[in-house]
UniProtKB/Swiss-Prot annotation:
GO biological process terms on file: translation
Function noted in UniProt: One of the primary rRNA binding proteins, it binds directly to 16S rRNA where it helps nucleate assembly of the platform of the 30S subunit by binding and bridging several RNA helices of the 16S rRNA.
Pfam families (UniProt xref): Ribosomal_S15 (PF00312)
Organism: Amoebophilus asiaticus (strain 5a2)
GO molecular function: rRNA binding; structural constituent of ribosome
Gene that specifies this protein: rpsO
Top-rank taxon: Bacteria
Record flagged with keyword Ion transport: no
Family annotation (CDD domains): Ribosomal_S15p_S13e
Protein name, per record: Small ribosomal subunit protein uS15
Protein family: Belongs to the universal ribosomal protein uS15 family.
Gene Ontology cellular-component annotations: cytosolic small ribosomal subunit
Amino acid sequence: MALNKEDKKDIFLTYSAKNVAQDTGSPESQIALFSNRITYLTEHLKQYPKDKASRLGLIKLVGKRKKQLTYLQNTAIERYRDIIVKLGIRK
């Protein structure tokens, strides 16, 4: 599951506010990384529905992403709307 450096750089370039690969701390980058991991875990749980540890990890990731989205919504509403559209997240 672990993303290699190139995949992470692609995610950061695509979704970061500054469009640089080193922008790992921006909320957009964090949300995109969480979304990637959530997608992977969702597919994993479809194949292995009894994997309770992965289910717990998925629930925690969704909570972390939700907190980041709330922060972004309260601080920069336009950036929030852009990332929601780019990632296709329903809110």
